[in-house]
Amino acid sequence: MFENDILVAGADPGFGAIKLDIGDTKILFPAVICNGSERIFSTLGRTELERGSDIDRQVASLDVIVKNNSTGVERHYFMGSLAESLNPKEAHYCWDEDKSTDEEAMSLLIVGLALAQPYPKTNIYLGTGVPVKFYASLKDKYEAELKGSFSVTFLSGPFKGQTRSMNILRSRVLPQSYGVFIKETLTEDGNATNAKLFGGYVVVIDPGFRTTDIATFYDGIMLDPPNSFSIEKGLQWAYTGVAEKLKEMTANHASPIETDDKELDKIFRVNKGLYPWNNGAIDLNPVMKRMLSQLAADISREVMKTLKPMAGRIHTVLVAGKVGEMVFEYLNLENKVLIDDPQFGNAAGFRIMAANLVNNLTRKVNVD
């Protein structure tokens, strides 16, 4: 994790959730944000998880001030589940594909890093990724923008009153899905862990919140488009279908239910798919299963169509991501394998990539 006092971190700042991996610590929270405000009544009673680690309880109470130490600009935000609870009308996802210049998206990433860092002040070497379709246009921009000095002050939770500062020394960017391949094939020291995946055709499928990224490898090398590509469909598409069905199911009521992906994400994440309704609840799980099955069918069809020239020669299809785990059983693809800890597949791989780069730099300095 540490090389010469540098914290090596892997970040997967998706449209639906922030995932951070520093080796022995992983951070996960909904990528939901809104402007913060003074809290009066919301501080009364039980506002935090009673169980879990300090980090678990802090993740549930992200009332923070984020400061760019280079510009002096600071912002007060509610993030994650706290934003969903305290300001559901204003809480939102960050939809900009270019997160490097989106102040709110950057703040979500900075807070994730602050949660992960073990010391009040830390130097960070960051590995992260962008969707396959945007890699060529955004890689250099991300690496130029994702660095600098920042601080986070926690206004609630176990870390209340603490300020954590960081200096992001450098960021290295890979395509989404490449992180999964690295996780499955390399150690932090650059040693191979699965020789089979370095030979022949291997496909990585990483369904996400808005998009599904597909990366094709031959002898360990990621192939260019059209063999590596993005599908504009993910969990959000399934939520849209669930919302339409829910409205249809309550159409005869005086006030048919109109919901959105943000609320449904919380319903499935917190309420296990039970939508509170009329002194009871509507079980949305059967509808969700049908939508996930259709999503998997669409992904399978697109993969088979695009990769038809190599049909029969793909010996492993690695499936990653939380959404990948949800659709895995429905994917109609041969030789499919669900990786271990699928939600952190990219974040772990990006960390391993960054660790290898730091180790290489350290060895070069020692040799010189």
What are these regions (language model features)?
Residues 1-202, 221-232, 270-368:
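Nucleotide/phosphate-binding catalytic cleft detector across ATP-hydrolyzing
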Residues 18-21, 212-216:
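Short beta-strand scaffold segments in enzyme catalytic cores
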Residues 207, 216-259:
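Long, well-ordered mid-to-C-terminal structural blocks that present hydrophobic/aromatic surfaces
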Residues 238-296:
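C-terminal amphipathic alpha-helical segment
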